[in-house]
Amino acid sequence: MKAAPFSYRRAQTLEEALLAGGENARFLAGGQSLLPMMNLRVTWADTVVDLSTLEELRRCRREGDRAFIGAGVTHAMIEDVRIDDPSRGYLPHVAAGIAYRSVRNRGTLGGSLVHADPAADWPTALLALGAEVAVKGAGGERRMPLAEFQRGLMETALEEGEILTGVSVPVLSSRARWSYLKFCRKSGEFAHSIAPMVCDPERGLGEAVLGAAADKPRRLPRLSALLAAGERPGGTELTQAADDDVQEVTGLERASYPFHLHRTMILRAWARLKELA
């Protein structure tokens, strides 16, 4: 199956891209999500605006105790640490597990976030890192927490004509600990469960998140509170917190296979976090 007819424009600057965007226009970065969906006619566009050559979308910089990563940075650039890593290995670890190398060479950080597939890596991993996103449109730039940007299944807070320009994440301290576990039935496919945890007392960061389980990645409130408080319970207290969190964010029956899968992934991620402590 092939995409419906559309016109193609390659933007030379971000301002040119913003002018070209409009009703029934789509922005193309790496094309690893948009093009397959257009070929399947799940989505369509009158105009496709190519952002792939815009160097300004690949720029990275420090902003105090946070780091800004351009939306055009590819998964492979993060995996190979061709940009500064503010996460003490967390982001390269996540990037290395995305699909296949050919996909990682083309796919971009921003493209994954805009696509907003709840089973994708970056929406879940960056939520656990306390990320904020920057978007730009005709009215200027605005920033918001990633949790607000992700509204639901393949739905974001982007307005018509806006472009995601980058992501801001905290620079983790030497006291930071993290774990990231993902379950796939075979290598390279989308996950059936993702369980990241990030804890950094110096940054006031303690987040446990569950991905590939609902309409969007969801914060696990009880486990996040335990991480933020520096508590490391085990046994019944831990399993009860995990069970209650999974049921709250998924609504699954406790006897079901998906519930057991998510619960197991969370407990393994917690155990891995303790090993790193």
Predicted feature descriptions by range:
Residues M1-A277:
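C-terminal structural segment of proteins
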